[in-house]
Amino acid sequence: MEIKEMVTSEMPRERLLSHGAKSLSNTELLAILINTGRKGFLSIDISNELLKSASNLNELKKSSINDLIQVKGIGLQKAITLKAAFELGERMGRRAENNRIKITQPSDVADYMIPTMKDLTQEHFVILLLNSKNVVIKESCVFKGTLNSSIVHPREIFSIAVRENANAIIAVHNHPSGDVTPSQEDIITTMRLKESGLILGIDLLDHIIIGDNRFTSLVEAGYFDEND
C-alpha cells in the first residue's frame, strides 16, 4: 500500500496545497520527502518510524546515511534525499541567523525599515520582535490604514510577541505625508502599548515614525520619560 491509496484530502501533498506547509506535521513533511512507501507501509508510516529513531528533529538531522537506512523503508536514495534536505535547512537557518539585525539605537530601526516603508501610500503599523540580545527575530504588520488608538489593540500585538517568545518589541509605522511629527493618536497608542508591556513583562523599547527618508523616535522625543 502506498500513499496514493490514502483519501485524497488527507494526503500530505494535497494538504500542503490546500492549507500551506505550516499546516503539516513533522510526520507529514517527512512523508513528502520520502515520497513513496514500500509493500505494507505508507510513506507516512515510514515517516513515523523515522521520527521514532531520534529523540527530536535536531537529533534526526544529525543522523548519518547509515543511521537513516537502518529505518525500515528507507533505502539509500531516500536517505540521500533526507540528508540533503536536512543540510539545506541547516544552511538556510545559518543564513537567517547571520542576516538578523541587532538594534542598539533608533537609527538602526530607521535604517532597517525606511527602505520598505518610506514610499508606502497607506499607513502600516509594524512591530519588530526582539530577543534578549535585542536582535530582530521577526517583524509583523498588524494594521494598515489611518492609525487610531482604538483600533491598535495591545492584546493583538502582545499575543504575537508571546507566541514568538519575544523579549521586547519596537513599534514602527509610517506617515505617507512624509511629516514625522507624532500625532496625538500616535502618542496615545504608544502609551497604551508601553503600559501593557510593563504589565506583561515584554517591554516596548521605542515607537519609530517613518517619513520620507526621515524618522522620529518617541524615545528620543522624550515620550518614554518616567515623568511623562
Curated annotation (Swiss-Prot):
The keyword Cytoplasm does not apply. It comes from the Bacteria. A motif (JAMM motif) lies at residues 173-186. The keyword Transcription regulation does not apply. GO terms for biological process: proteolysis. Belongs to the UPF0758 family. This is UPF0758 protein SAB1521c. It comes from Staphylococcus aureus (strain bovine RF122 / ET3-1).
